C-alpha cells in the first residue's frame, strides 16, 4: 500500500514538474487592420503542444484601456499598469484553473487576454479576484468551447507573411548577439513557383534586369498547381 501511495505521489510530482517546464515560444508582432495598428503577443508553440489537447476551453478577458493614443494603443504611462494586470491574471488563472496563457490582442483601446483551460469553474470570480485591485478598469470575460483552437489560430497566431518577418527578425537579432554588424554582403536564396513556363520566363527576365541571378529553372514532378520552379 505504501509503495502504491509513493508511486502515485511520484507520478503527480512528475506531472507537475513537466507542466512547470513548459514555457512556450513567445514573440510579438504588429499589423495594420483598417489603417490602425494591432499589437499581438503570442505563444507560437501552444497549438502544437500537448497543452492544446489538454485545455479545450477558451477564456477571454476583455479589458478597456483607460488612456489611449490617437491610434488606439495605450499611452506609455499606462503600460506598467497593464503589465501588472496581465501578470495577475496569468498567475491567478494558471494557479486556480491550471489555465494556459496563450497571448494578448490589443486594438482600438482594448486589450484581450486569451487563456485555454480544461477547468472553467468559477472563472468569472477568479478574474474578478485580480481585477478588483484595479477598480478604474472596466472589463468582461467570455468562455466557450474551442477544441479546434479557432481563437488562437485566427486571432493570435501570425499569418505566413508575419511568421516570416518574425523568423527574419530573430535571425538578425541572433547575428547582432554574436557581434555581427550586418555590413557584409550575403547570398540570399529565393525559390518561386509558377503555373506556366511562360510566366516563369517572363518573371526571370524582369528580376535579371534588376541584378538578380537565376541559378536553376526546373519542373516539380507530381505538382499540378505551380510546377515550374525558379531559383
Where are these regions (language model features)?
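Long, contiguous binding/interaction regions
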Residues: 20-231
Amino acid at each position: 500500500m505504501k509503495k502504491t501511495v509513493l508511486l502515485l505521489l511520484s507520478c503527480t510530482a512528475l506531472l507537475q514538474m513537466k507542466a512547470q517546464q513548459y514555457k512556450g515560444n513567445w514573440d510579438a508582432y504588429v499589423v495594420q487592420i483598417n489603417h490602425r495598428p494591432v499589437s499581438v503577443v503570442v505563444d507560437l508553440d501552444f497549438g502544437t503542444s500537448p497543452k492544446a489537447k489538454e485545455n479545450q476551453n477558451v477564456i477571454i478577458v476583455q479589458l478597456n484601456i483607460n488612456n489611449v493614443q490617437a491610434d488606439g494603443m495605450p499611452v506609455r504611462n499606462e503600460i506598467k499598469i497593464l503589465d501588472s494586470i496581465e501578470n495577475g491574471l496569468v498567475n491567478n488563472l494558471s494557479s486556480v484553473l491550471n489555465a494556459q496563457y496563450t497571448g494578448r490582442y490589443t486594438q482600438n483601446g482594448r486589450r484581450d487576454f486569451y487563456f485555454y483551460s480544461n477547468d472553467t469553474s468559477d472563472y468569472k470570480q477568479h478574474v474578478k479576484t485580480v481585477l478588483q485591485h484595479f477598480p478604474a478598469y472596466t472589463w468582461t470575460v467570455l468562455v466557450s468551447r474551442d477544441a479546434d483552437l479557432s481563437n488562437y489560430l485566427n486571432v493570435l497566431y501570425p499569418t505566413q507573411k508575419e511568421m516570416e518577418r518574425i523568423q527574419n527578425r530573430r535571425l538578425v537579432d541572433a547575428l547582432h548577439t554574436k557581434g555581427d554588424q550586418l555590413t557584409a554582403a550575403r547570398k540570399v536564396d529565393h525559390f518561386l513557383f509558377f503555373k506556366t513556363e511562360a510566366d516563369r520566363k517572363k518573371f526571370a527576365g524582369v528580376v535579371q534586369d534588376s541584378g538578380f541571378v537565376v541559378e536553376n529553372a526546373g519542373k516539380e514532378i507530381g505538382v499540378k498547381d505551380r510546377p515550374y520552379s525558379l531559383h
